[in-house]
UniProtKB/Swiss-Prot annotation:
It comes from Wolbachia sp. subsp. Brugia malayi (strain TRS). This is Aspartate carbamoyltransferase catalytic subunit. It holds the Pfam family OTCace. PROSITE patterns: CARBAMOYLTRANSFERASE (PS00097). Coiled coil: none annotated. Heterododecamer (2C3:3R2) of six catalytic PyrB chains organized as two trimers (C3), and six regulatory PyrI chains organized as three dimers (R2). The gene is pyrB. Carbamoyl phosphate binds at residues 54-55, 104, 132, 135, 260-261. It catalyses: carbamoyl phosphate + L-aspartate = N-carbamoyl-L-aspartate + phosphate + H(+). The keyword Transferase applies.
Length: 298
């Protein structure tokens, strides 16, 4: 167990790790990866305590395409609903000797506790507002496919920064490669405690000036308490929603990204092309194949 390497945070990556995973993902994207059944006779358990379309489906498709036996546990009908403690549940699953457990949980940091109770490899598929490392890898992959290098790119992340695990993971990963990170959000949804951030704006038009990449985030109302003041949907779109007119403030070759799910008319208008956003989904599948491959147990 001491030799295993979990994937819980972007901070678990070295620069070499990222390069190797991106190289593998490129091979999977082009269907050129050798030994496509590399996970044959391996078992992957997907344990998702939050709703998911993109991440769950892509992890399941990735594992199956690599030859793994895949178990996606229906949490809503599991023993958790009979009062079983989460630690006991993870120990029970670990006793079945899977090779991977892929976890999404609504509580920030919970994956670090769970990792102490398993002998298999644990992959964080999103924990509360904390981290989403494979989404950050997918976003890095997309950006690097459109831009010559990450260094010195002005990357603007706009939206509900406070509650976003995608923002946290992207900030850390992209800064590792020298990007200039700018945040745009309402004052009540910003987080000022990122040493990696270069600038903060409370106006989208000001923030995206000369931007190379604009990454939009949805309002995560399910994580907000009743005392969290936010603009109405209409006000939010007026101030922080991106449309084709506001996009003119960015560089002419700027790319627009969104990790999904998208709320049209709130953070983005329908007149913005979603080509890159769909590419994030496509590249996300290749990244998850690469991650399962790269971290495969001996």
């Amino acid at each position: 167990m001491s030799n295993r390497k979990d994937l819980l945070s972007v901070l678990d990556f070295t620069v070499n790790d990222v390069g190797n995973i991106i190289e593998l993902a490129g091979q999977y994207l082009e269907n050129k990866a050798a030994n496509g059944r590399i996970l044959e006779n391996k078992t992957v358990i997907n344990l998702f305590f939050e709703d998911s379309t993109r991440t769950l489906t892509s992890f399941e498709m990735a594992a199956k395409s690599l030859g793994a036996n895949v178990v996606t546990l229906p949490v809503k009908s599991s023993s958790i609903n009979k009062g079983e403690d989460l630690t006991d549940m993870i120990k029970t699953l670990n006793a079945m000797n899977p090779d991977y457990i892929v976890v999404r949980q609504k509580s920030s940091g919970i994956v670090n506790m769970l990792a102490k109770h398993v002998s298999c490899l644990l992959i964080n598929a999103g924990d509360g507002s904390s981290e989403h490392p494979t989404q950050a890898l997918a976003d890095y992959f997309v950006i690097s496919s459109h831009k010559k290098q990450i260094k010195n790119l002005k990357i603007v992340i706009c939206g509900d920064i406070l509650h976003s695990r995608v923002a946290r993971s992207n900030i850390r990963l992209l800064k590792m490669f020298g990007a200039k990170i700018c945040l745009v959000a309402p004052p009540t949804l910003i987080c000022k405690h990122f040493p990696e951030v270069d600038s903060i704006y409370y106006s989208l038009i000001e923030g995206i000036k000369d931007a190379d990449v604009i990454m939009l985030l949805r309002l995560q109302k399910e994580r907000m308490n009743s005392g969290c003041f936010i603009p109405s949907n209409r006000e939010y779109f007026y101030l922080y929603g991106l449309d084709s007119q506001k996009l003119l403030c960015a560089k002419s070759n700027a790319i627009v990204m969104h990790p999904g799910p998208i709320n049209r008319g709130i953070e983005i208008s329908s007149d913005i092309t979603d080509h890159i956003i769909l590419q994030q989904v496509e590249f996300g599948l290749a990244i998850r194949k690469a991650v399962l491959h790269y971290y495969r147990p001996c």
